[in-house]
Amino acid sequence: MTLAKDIARDLLDIKAVYLKPEEPFTWASGIKSPIYTDNRITLSYPETRTLIENGFVETIKEAFPEVEVIAGTATAGIPHGAIIADKMNLPFAYIRSKPKDHGAGNQIEGRVTKGQKMVIIEDLISTGGSVLDAVAAAQREGADVLGVVAIFTYELPKATANFEKASVKLVTLSNYSELIKVAKVQGYIDADGLTLLKKFKENQETWQD
């Protein structure tokens, strides 16, 4: 199996991902979705966690070999980022969604120097808005953000457009297309469910029509 398939299988097995094409979830954005993902659960499963962290390390070495500092998004990217930085013997920082309203008012915790080549770790990409805010915060502090690496992406067109607009490279360990294929093979969904899941990827507004 490839890394993308292995991670997709594990996410399904540990119930970090739920697929309910017939009874969709409602996201915070209001979108009705056949999938719900909580990758924080991966931290509770050592084998899955190790698979993911090793995948991150190999992916970063291949895609961003010049990296000098790892940063995690608060809060989901922090534990993964800290483990990765430790494995790669690199400095670590984390980026808040907004500056603290007390003390020094920091948005980035940890020491980041001007021009330092940074890779930002995220657990899940939906539209990409929150992690791209983190990228912008790091750039304001003078970091040279090489790109974002995430565990999983829904592959939504809006995310692709947002990353292209921001001129930020995105690499993920697994993705929606791989996951629904694995889900069908392993019996998590039937043929009708697979059809609905494919329609969701094509159009998040009309997939139920």
Curated annotation (Swiss-Prot):
- The UniProt annotation places 5-phospho-alpha-D-ribose 1-diphosphate binding at 96, 100, 102, 122-130
Q: Identify the domain of life.
A: Bacteria
The enzyme's E.C. designation: 2.4.2.10
Task: Extract the Pfam families matched here.
Answer: Pribosyltran
Q: Which residues bind orotate?
A: 126
Record key words, sorted: Glycosyltransferase, Magnesium, Pyrimidine biosynthesis, Transferase
Catalyzed reactions per annotation: orotidine 5'-phosphate + diphosphate = orotate + 5-phospho-alpha-D-ribose 1-diphosphate
Task: Name any cofactors this protein relies on.
Answer: Mg(2+)
Pathway(s) it belongs to: Pyrimidine metabolism; UMP biosynthesis via de novo pathway; UMP from orotate: step 1/2
One of its GO biological process terms is: pyrimidine nucleobase biosynthetic process
The record's top EC class is transferase
Q: Give GO MF terms, alphabetically.
A: magnesium ion binding; orotate phosphoribosyltransferase activity
What is the stated purpose of this protein?
A: Catalyzes the transfer of a ribosyl phosphate group from 5-phosphoribose 1-diphosphate to orotate, leading to the formation of orotidine monophosphate (OMP).
The UniProt subunit note reads as follows: Homodimer.
* HAMAP family named in the record: PyrE
| Family (UniProt) | Belongs to the purine/pyrimidine phosphoribosyltransferase family. PyrE subfamily.
> Can you name this protein?
Orotate phosphoribosyltransferase
According to its UniProt entry, this protein's organism is Streptococcus mutans serotype c (strain ATCC 700610 / UA159)
Origin organism lineage: Bacteria, Bacillati, Bacillota, Bacilli, Lactobacillales
Q: Which gene encodes it?
A: pyrE
